[in-house]
């Protein structure tokens, strides 16, 4: 794979939008590039977007490609994607949106509700944005996050798009799947730890620390949104494309996890 040298470009530090540190990213022309920081985030982004192309996902999602980045004498694995914002558009995270209209922190507000279904604040978002299918959108996001075990979904990477010219809101494509599938091998999920250890340690966000509790609450309110149409063979083929960039232990862990997830979420698997 071609190595892209970014020494001539200043990185934008991806801080404030993840709970796990400071990831290097670059905006060059109409593409974003992100360097792996915690482990195999690039592989995670690429694999999730590849597999979503074999699904009935009713909402748009960012498509990622693998990238190898050279910067300051170091080689990074990573990924790249097209900038999905058009002219006059800005991305508004729910945290910023909620603060703008209420003066309160959404993350703090969620902790005030004892019942998970009450924390899924769809009505408030729809009233502010005039988007009428936000509940279905949020449910699809939680289905993706539960299946791929995204530990980093929070009120700063659930977002809507605002057009400053028309002053209208629309749904954002799904993005930020880098910390799926135990990709953080530097801190929380070392590659020599068992799958059972990782499963016992991981916690969901933002409505519950349990993936299934928040998913069940959303699906009960808004119904099942996604059908996955890929096979385990598809997973192996997609992983093979990136096997030269990541250790065999990483590929084996992802295969093992996704085989388990296909069994656990069999109701989402569509032939």
Q: What residue ranges belong to the model's regions?
A:
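Conserved kinase catalytic-core segment
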Residues: 117-181
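Generic structural hydrophobic/aromatic packing signal, biased to beta-strands
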Residues: 28, 33, 64, 81, ...
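Conserved ATP-binding subdomain of kinase catalytic cores across diverse folds
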Residues: 1-104
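ATP-dependent phospho-/nucleotidyl transfer catalytic cores
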Residues: 83-142, 245, 249-253, 264-265, ...
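Short coil/loop linkers at secondary-structure junctions
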Residues: 58-59, 132, 178, 268
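C-terminal catalytic region of ATP-dependent kinase domains
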Residues: 36-37, 166-271
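Short alpha-helical "patches" and their helix-cap loops
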Residues: 62-71, 154-164, 271
């Amino acid at each position: 794979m071609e190595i892209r040298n970014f020494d001539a470009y200043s990185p934008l530090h991806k801080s404030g939008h993840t709970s796990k540190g400071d990831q290097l990213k670059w905006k060059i022309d109409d593409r974003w590039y992100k360097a792996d920081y915690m482990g195999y985030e690039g592989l995670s982004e690429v694999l999730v977007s590849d597999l979503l192309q074999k699904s009935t996902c009713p909402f748009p999602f960012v498509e990622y490609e693998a990238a190898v980045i050279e910067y300051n004498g170091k080689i990074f694995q990573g990924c790249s994607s097209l900038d999905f914002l058009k002219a006059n558009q800005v991305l508004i995270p729910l945290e910023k949106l909620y603060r703008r209209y209420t003066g309160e922190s959404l993350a703090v507000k969620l902790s005030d509700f004892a019942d998970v279904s009450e924390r899924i604040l769809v009505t408030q978002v729809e009233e502010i944005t005039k988007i009428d299918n936000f509940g279905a959108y949020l449910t699809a996001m939680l289905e993706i996050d539960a299946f791929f075990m995204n530990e980093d979904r929070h009120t700063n990477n659930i977002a809507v798009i605002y057009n400053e010219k028309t002053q209208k809101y629309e749904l954002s494509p799904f993005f930020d799947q880098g910390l799926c599938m135990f990709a953080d091998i530097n801190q929380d999920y070392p590659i020599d730890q068992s799958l059972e250890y990782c499963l016992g340690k991981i916690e969901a966000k933002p409505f519950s620390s349990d993936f299934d509790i928040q998913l069940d609450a959303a699906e009960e309110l808004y119904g099942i949104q996604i059908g996955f149409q890929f096979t385990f063979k598809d997973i192996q083929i997609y992983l093979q494309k990136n096997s030269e960039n990541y250790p065999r232990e990483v590929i084996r862990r992802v295969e093992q996890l996704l085989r388990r997830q296909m069994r656990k979420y069999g109701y989402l698997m569509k032939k």
